[in-house]
């Protein structure tokens, strides 16, 4: 999809750059593949804010997307490509030969009328899903499982992908777009191609109101607060905060590592995404 820029006939259109969605389905989603979505506003079960800067936004229906692709050896035809407000990527409605319908993540270069299939070994075409044991080395993939049968977890956002770079015993080596090189079991499923909507990161929403429609609230700087609210707060006049940048709870921010070094999956990471910063 291309980008649309606007002649600024109103202040909210100045600098506005949006995704051109003219080729997407303009109707409502399939009712049987949707469910209600309750807004949490960043609160947990006790009503306390656990995720700041969330709240409001337009009402949404959740589209049930098939991340597992477990309907093997049954061909499906793409009926339409749809917008999904719950993710940055587009989704494709597919109808299987037995009449069942499903939503899947739409990869780039997948069009209406195309055939897709999930199998132990299938053609290397966008939208086809198979385990790494059936993929040739060098393939660009998305929607990658970390555990067999759990459903895709890696490379699901707009424009993302990973490259299958090698085999190591019962594992497949994949290079992620972050630069990380990691192992996953060869039985894990992956879908051929890169995720649709690669221009998503080039959007400019133009005004604060459009961001509010997406359910995001303002991000207030600590130095603009009072001392009771933030370690950087207070002071006479404008101050720099007076210390290294910290979170509202006094922990170092801007670069501090938060991943547990003893995490079980650490041994599956061959090369860290931070390696390029360390000059390795």
UniProtKB/Swiss-Prot annotation:
Lineage of producing organism: Bacteria, Pseudomonadati, Pseudomonadota, Alphaproteobacteria, Rhodobacterales
Subunit structure of this chain's protein: Part of the 50S ribosomal subunit. Forms a bridge to the 30S subunit in the 70S ribosome.
Biological process per Gene Ontology, one example term: cytoplasmic translation
Name of this chain's protein: Large ribosomal subunit protein uL2
Keyword Ribosomal protein among UniProt keywords: yes
Free-text function comment from the UniProt entry: One of the primary rRNA binding proteins. Required for association of the 30S and 50S subunits to form the 70S ribosome, for tRNA binding and peptide bond formation. It has been suggested to have peptidyltransferase activity; this is somewhat controversial. Makes several contacts with the 16S rRNA in the 70S ribosome.
Biased composition (Basic residues): 270-280
GO cellular component term of the entry, any: large ribosomal subunit
Keywords on record: Ribonucleoprotein, Ribosomal protein, RNA-binding, rRNA-binding
């Amino acid at each position: 999809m291309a980008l649309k820029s606007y002649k600024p006939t109103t202040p909210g259109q100045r600098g506005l750059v949006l995704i051109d969605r003219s080729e997407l389905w303009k109707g409502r989603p399939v009712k049987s593949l949707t469910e209600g979505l309750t807004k949490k506003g960043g609160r947990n079960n006790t009503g306390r804010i656990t995720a700041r800067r969330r709240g409001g936004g337009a009402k949404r229906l959740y589209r049930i997307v098939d991340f597992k692709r477990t309907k093997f050896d049954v061909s499906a035809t793409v009926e339409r490509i749809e917008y999904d407000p719950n993710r940055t990527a587009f989704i494709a409605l597919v109808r299987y030969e037995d009449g069942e319908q499903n939503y899947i993540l739409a990869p780039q270069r997948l069009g209406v009328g195309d055939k897709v299939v999930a199998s132990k070994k299938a053609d290397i075409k966008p939208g086809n899903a198979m385990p790494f044991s059936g993929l040739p080395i060098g393939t660009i993939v998305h929607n990658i499982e970390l555990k067999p049968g759990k459903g895709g977890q890696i490379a699901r956002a707009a424009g993302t992908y990973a490259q299958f770079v090698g085999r190591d015993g019962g594992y497949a080596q994949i290079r992620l777009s972050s630069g990380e090189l990691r192992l996953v079991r060869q039985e894990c499923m992956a879908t051929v191609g890169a995720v649709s909507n690669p221009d998503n990161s080039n959007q400019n929403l133009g005004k604060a109101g459009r961001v509010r429609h997406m359910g995001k609230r303002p991000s207030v700087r600590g130095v603009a607060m009072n001392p009771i609210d933030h370690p950087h707060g207070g002071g006479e006049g404008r101050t720099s905060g007076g210390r290294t940048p910290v979170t509202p709870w006094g922990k170092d921010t801007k670069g501090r590592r938060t991943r547990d070094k003893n995490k079980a999956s650490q041994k599956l990471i061959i090369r860290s995404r931070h390696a390029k910063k360390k000059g390795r």
